[in-house]
């Protein structure tokens, strides 16, 4: 094509700028117009003033309100006016043009929602934000997402052998494994750089939590895919509600939002109200932020001012309430999912130090919707120390107990909510010696009586046996507490109920001259480990059975406590029972020291089953199990057949000893599963056909059991004999 022809075509093409519509392209590319309003803020809620007084009000804003925030440009204030009764009156709006963007951003952060004057609360926004709000379309259009079925998040509970899983974190690798007693663990998944700090399980074991510089990730299902993600930069701590509905995250660093108009701001879950906050409460199902909080006041004596007592919030048993204490002042109780304060105000309690929720939701009766909360306050001037029980949401005081000469208190709820033990550390009037006693609230009884267990020593540790009225304590004389080799006493107590005599907690037995300082009750009760943790020279483990079987055991005895084993794990830093209460793991982690890092697995008697020395070992955590769905009747039926189950389990243990037997057993289970599936389909089809033809359904009488017998043929020997013609 000749150049002359091209020039002729260009002359014929006439395009006017006003005819070009690029609005759709601007919306698609999220183009921000350079309007130059980044430094302008709009303040709503200002006092209504006459036009003659506007300069006085501007001077008040500059010198009193905005002096520590930023400098406003010369003639940078503007107030719109309207005519009222012959006078020009302001509309309660003020425009302020700052010298830089930082001043405008800080003004929004510091003044928005704050009561600046007695009857005036400011609402502050940047002018760019208002422009964006005005451009919001009248009709909302949403993008439809294709439904994807989720994996079964509790599939591990269907394991044929009923095994438990655990996490092993070493170096930069995280692995999930099946426990196989003394055999090498069966690895399920192993990933590199799965987390950047540490890992943890949710309370029921549904999710595995990994923490990263940008936030939190939840993992689960058979494929261990990502279930949820929560953006929280530099997150340090995570806590779940008991039923895994909500999640609380906390970071040393407050959240900072990108400048208005920045593309990254649109992808963040945070609003302007969340800026500068450290703690966030999330709804796990939706991924929404329910509420954000600023960092609480730091404890006195913290070296760098970055110490925090975790968890900041404590949850009620039913996930309905979470509460936080402001030491010395109040307890704030929030209701989910709105996260609004109950009755819109905190519970003012002078001197309050700590509180604990009752671990069950029916402590006040099955029909009651009230949750029980216990707190304590120290002695203040002429007022005694006090322990109180209050119900939420009514905030009614259920029971109080005054205490004297108190140094400290610790609250210990029994797992069923039947008892609350308050460990009270007391001092003599001369304050030269200290001792402890136990104030036990019997929650289920009328008027909640309080029983006092007096002791001569200082109680160092306390532990209830799960779902029981027995407990153990470690105590020592206050004169030897500061010595290098402290000898402690291990004591057991139980609740005695006899006819014609008052019920009371009675001492059972004491083991003296021990070195233990920590107690770990098995999740199912009966067994306990007394350990020495935190020492640089002693790493003792002692295993106890509270119901040791002997011929001399008295039928009405509260317990028959017997030491059934002992062990030592050099460098031990952590101890944990598995969810079944059959195994105990002790670990030595690199976060404390670099000596013989790894873990040991023992049974409940203390017999060593397996030991693994792993360099840069960081964590060993058993996967929790949700509460059992079995009823008391189901449990009784299982106990009746326990001998049959034991015989079956022994046979399976023998079969599992070789890999060939394991493969054969797995193949048989697969065939039985396929046959059972086919059988269920046939039964359903036959039932449908009988219903169509009017025939009654085939049922098995309730008093009879359906028995499926499997016949397995095995070749014991094979011999070939020649046959003569």
UniProtKB/Swiss-Prot annotation:
It comes from the Eukaryota. Transmembrane segments: none annotated. CDD domains: RRM_eIF3B. PROSITE patterns: RRM (PS50102). InterPro entries: EIF3B, eIF3B_RRM, Nucleotide-bd_a/b_plait_sf, RRM_dom, RRM_dom_euk, TIF_beta_prop-like, WD40/YVTN_repeat-like_dom_sf. GO terms for cellular component: cytoplasm; cytoplasmic stress granule; cytosol; eukaryotic 43S preinitiation complex; eukaryotic 48S preinitiation complex; eukaryotic translation initiation factor 3 complex; eukaryotic translation initiation factor 3 complex, eIF3e; eukaryotic translation initiation factor 3 complex, eIF3m. Its main location: cytoplasm. Gene3D superfamilies: 3.30.70.330, YVTN repeat-like/Quinoprotein amine dehydrogenase. It holds the Pfam family eIF2A. The keyword Protein biosynthesis applies. Component of the eukaryotic translation initiation factor 3 (eIF-3) complex. The eIF-3 complex appears to include tif32/eif3a, SPAC25G10.08/eif3b, tif33/eif3c, SPBC4C3.07/eif3f, tif35/eif3g and sum1/eif3i. This set of common subunits may also associate exclusively with either moe1/eif3d and int6/eif3e, or with SPAC821.05/eif3h and SPAC1751.03/eif3m. The eIF-3 complex may also include SPAC3A12.13c/eif3j. RNA-binding component of the eukaryotic translation initiation factor 3 (eIF-3) complex, which is involved in protein synthesis of a specialized repertoire of mRNAs and, together with other initiation factors, stimulates binding of mRNA and methionyl-tRNAi to the 40S ribosome. The eIF-3 complex specifically targets and initiates translation of a subset of mRNAs involved in cell proliferation. Belongs to the eIF-3 subunit B family. This is Eukaryotic translation initiation factor 3 subunit B. It comes from Schizosaccharomyces pombe (strain 972 / ATCC 24843).
